[in-house]
């Protein structure tokens, strides 16, 4: 948009200069032709022509003096404007690259944080799984120990009961021996029979 406006302004100035120059050249020539046609017998008035050429040169110099500064300032202004535009474009490009780099770093950081959270969740899941298995192993070991303790306690209780019954049996047998006056062989047979009954019972 700016480039087209600049070209349009430049063309306008050049067109004006060309029109002025053409006008300055054509006017003296037409005047000379008209004057020569009217006085063909006298020939060309070179003095008059010289003054007209001098007027033309002065006029061209005047126009150059009036327009040169404007044309120069115009091109100088356009040069500064183009320089400013290029500088703004460069700064905008650097800002865009900086923003892109900043967003890329934020994206990489977010990706690493998400990966870290995923690893933490997976580690927690693994730790929870191992904790559950460890608790199950401990519970099974405790159950086994409790069962073993109950069995040992029952065996101990049964052994004590058998001893008490054996003592009672010996007392009864002794009483029977004293009452019946049986032989020792009979005593052993009676004890054996009683023990067999107790074993079958338990």
UniProtKB/Swiss-Prot annotation:
- Keyword annotations of the record: ATP synthesis, Cell inner membrane, Cell membrane, CF(0), Hydrogen ion transport, Ion transport, Membrane, Transmembrane, Transmembrane helix, Transport
GO MF: proton-transporting ATP synthase activity, rotational mechanism; proton-transporting ATPase activity, rotational mechanism
Instruction: Provide the protein's localization.
Output: Cell inner membrane
Q: Report the superkingdom from the record.
A: Bacteria
Matching entries from Pfam families are given as: ATP-synt_B
Q: Which InterPro entries has this protein been placed in?
A: ATP_synth_b/b'su_bac/chlpt (IPR002146), ATP_synth_F0_bsu_bac (IPR005864), ATP_synthase_B_chain (IPR050059)
Q: Membrane: present as a keyword of the record?
A: yes
Membrane-crossing ranges are 17-37
- Signal peptide range equals none
Regarding the membrane, this protein is recorded as: Single-pass membrane protein
Kindly give the HAMAP family that the UniProt entry links to this protein: ATP_synth_b_bprime
Subunit architecture: F-type ATPases have 2 components, F(1) - the catalytic core - and F(0) - the membrane proton channel. F(1) has five subunits: alpha(3), beta(3), gamma(1), delta(1), epsilon(1). F(0) has three main subunits: a(1), b(2) and c(10-14). The alpha and beta chains form an alternating ring which encloses part of the gamma chain. F(1) is attached to F(0) by a central stalk formed by the gamma and epsilon chains, while a peripheral stalk is formed by the delta and b chains.
Name of the protein in question:
ATP synthase subunit b 1
